[in-house]
């Protein structure tokens, strides 16, 4: 179960760092698990910034990749673009510091999480999210101990999150098969 909690926290961290992503899409009971860097990014947004992010998030399917989304953001607001790039670089530096096995694992999680984004006007599909979490947990459990330790060291907020009793209850209930 400990490994599952690590993975759920890691998924949360990565989901929160996918740009553009709206904090309003995160249920209140999960917001406490979002890293401070991400909270600060969204907390310091103006109403205009929020509107720009909502507009771009609604068009996420039209962007071929993250760079295209950032370019669209730059065209709307250079200041917001700079903030987003700073947040992206923070996450990218952590990921780039990983050894190949850990980096591949994180890259796969990011791709999986991005694939879960709903189309315009659609809600998140909780069953797809649960299945994705199960798939990621299986991949995590197949990693060697050195890679698991590296992931824990690189994402220290995960340790704080997984020791939180509330998070453990949420993770257990979330992954229950219906």
Swiss-Prot record:
Biological role: Binds retinol and different fatty acids.
PTM (free text): N-glycosylated.
Family affiliation: Belongs to the fatty-acid and retinol-binding protein (FARBP) family.
Main location, first listed in the record: secreted
InterPro entries, alphabetized: Gp-FAR-1
Keyword field: Coiled coil, Glycoprotein, Lipid-binding, Retinol-binding, Secreted, Signal, Vitamin A
Domain of life: Eukaryota
Official protein name in the record: Fatty-acid and retinol-binding protein 1
Span of the signal peptide: 1-16
Pfam families for this protein: Gp-FAR-1
GO terms of molecular function: fatty acid binding; retinal binding; retinol binding
Any coiled-coil regions, as ranges: 67-89, 123-154
Subcellular location field: Secreted
């Amino acid at each position: 179960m400990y490994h599952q909690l690590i993975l759920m926290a890691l998924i949360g961290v990565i989901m929160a760092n996918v740009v553009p992503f709206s904090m309003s899409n995160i249920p209140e009971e999960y917001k406490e698990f979002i890293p401070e860097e991400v909270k600060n990014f969204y907390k310091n947004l103006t109403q205009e910034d929020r509107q720009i992010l909502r507009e771009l998030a609604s068009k996420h399917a039209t962007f071929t990749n993250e760079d295209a989304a950032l370019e669209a953001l730059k065209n709307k607001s250079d200041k917001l673009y700079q903030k987003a790039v700073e947040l992206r670089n923070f996450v990218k530096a952590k990921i780039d510091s990983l050894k190949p096995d850990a980096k591949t694992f994180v890259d796969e999680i990011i791709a999986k999480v991005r694939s879960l984004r709903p189309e315009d006007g659609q809600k998140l599909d909780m069953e797809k999210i649960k299945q994705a979490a199960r798939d990621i947990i299986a991949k995590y459990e197949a990693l060697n101990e050195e890679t698991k330790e590296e992931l824990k060291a690189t994402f220290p907020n995960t340790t704080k999150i997984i020791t939180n009793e509330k998070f453990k209850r949420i993770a257990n209930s979330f992954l229950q098969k219906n």
